[in-house]
Amino acid sequence: MRTLYHNARVYTGAETFSEAFLVEDGRFLAVGTETQMLSLSDADTVRVDLEGGFVCPGFNDSHMHLVGLGHVLDSAQLDRHTGSLSEMLRFLAAYAAQHPSRQGRWLFGRGWNQDYFSDAARLPNRADLDAVSTDYPIQIMRACGHCCVVNSRALALAGITADTTAPAGGAIGMENGQPDGRLYDNAMDLLTPFIPPPDKEELKQMIRLACGVLNSYGVTSAQTDDYCTFRAVNWETYNEAYRELEASGELTVRVNQQANFTTLPALRRFVEEGACGGPGSLLYRIGPLKMLGDGALGARTAHLSRNYADRPDTCGFSLYSAEHLNKMVSYANAHGMQVAIHAIGDACLDRVLDAVELALREHPRDDHRHGVVHCQISRPDQLERLRRLNMHIYAQSVFLDYDNHIVLSRVGPELAASSYSWKTLMEGGLSVSNGSDCPVELPDVMRGVECAVTRCSMDGTGPYLPGEAFTVREALDSYTIRGAEASFEEGFKGRIAPGYLADFTVLDRDPFETEPRSLHTIGVRSAWLGGSCVYEA
């Protein structure tokens, strides 16, 4: 079936704008003026009036946690109840009371940020959660996902005591010689054996919920790190859940799996069983090896080359030794895998660059597209190394909304002066894609576009390093064609052009004609996947 979409301002990804386009068999057939498209239509052509909307390629969130988003949607969502510690605890107690069927089981919540608490400028602790309940285990995850707090019941279940040794790459919070309920990074894995994992049907429901939210923000493609969401669930089950949803026609987002592995034996089995081989389908593909290099800036676990300016007793930490990271990256590179490694602190970035440089020296590859996820705190010498190694950058411009308030106080003026330098890297020839790291942030693309263009927070704080601001075109491209480049899909996705997948988003206003500080107010009218509407406001 041939369909004509008309009466629109169409940003194709090229320099010029169009008015209309034709779609046939899930792909763009032609793009041009309305007159040109009418000449290619006949009596059987279906016509869709886009009512003057702004059309761009479907948004591509190049790093997020899709299953994690689905899990949050089925848990206590704390992000809108973090104005104070007392408010968050009241909401958590009310949530538990409203879900009596869950009492006696684990109570999960996510989204809090202690920097927003008006009544207590500190992390919650076990005593705070014990006030909600000690009858059942409670775990609340900080927005960043690199720190959680549990109550006494959860600590007892996991056997975490004053004598428990934290695993490498993690930390157990202590107060007066006893665990205070705070667990950082790899220490959170101590809970894994005691949390009942979801079954495949529950995973599928999480994916359905998450896809609906992504579509509502105009997102039609997601590059997702799912395997780490529930460590007790094997990667085969995640893959089966996605492929069954694809087969039933319920997968409304094109997914590229950033395959998270922490050990060489697990990665080796994944590769030897052929899980990372082949192109996959147009809806579900296996992408790079994904690893977490360090923690987060907000929790002060990102690994810096010097101590934190506002916590001189710590510089954060890397989650793995340099030797282990080198082995993982070298194995993946030698077997044709792309790698994407989370690095927020500059000391962690040093390790990532060392590992990639070693791997490419051992097994050179012309178009490896190895990448750094986040790439936030950096030094000028590292920006040059990134360019020399031709790294892909998975940026999250939306992080500036919060980080504008903390980066200078956290890392000091010297490091802050060369951080979040994504425009510099782009001008140096690197491909910079954009994303949300959802559920760390909402997958709100237009909010991310505004942060990229203004370098300001939503409350007006900033601009932070305004010379690093993107143009509107660069910002839109970072959420479309650059995302496709991250996954080697730029030949058929990320543009509105003949032969490309007919994934597009319709906005209610033109970003090129919108005042920069109002970009976040632009709404999504509809989202289309392969020419089929998957969301309509």
Task: Briefly describe each language-model feature range.
Residues S330-A340, I344-H370, C375, P380-E384, ...:
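His/Asp/Glu-enriched, well-ordered alpha-helical/loop segment
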Residues H65, S281-T301, M391-D401:
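Non-cysteine beta-strand/loop elements that form the S-adenosyl-L-methionine
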Residues Y11-E15, S281-L282, E485, P516-L519:
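Short loop/turn motifs at secondary-structure junctions and domain boundaries
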Residues E246-S248, G274-S281, R365, L386-R388:
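Acidic (Asp/Glu)-rich catalytic clusters
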Residues R2-N7, G13-E272, M291, A296-Y331, ...:
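Divalent metal-binding segments
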Residues I522:
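Conserved catalytic core of nucleotide polymerization and phosphodiester-bond processing enzymes
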Residues G530-S532:
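Beta-rich accessory regions
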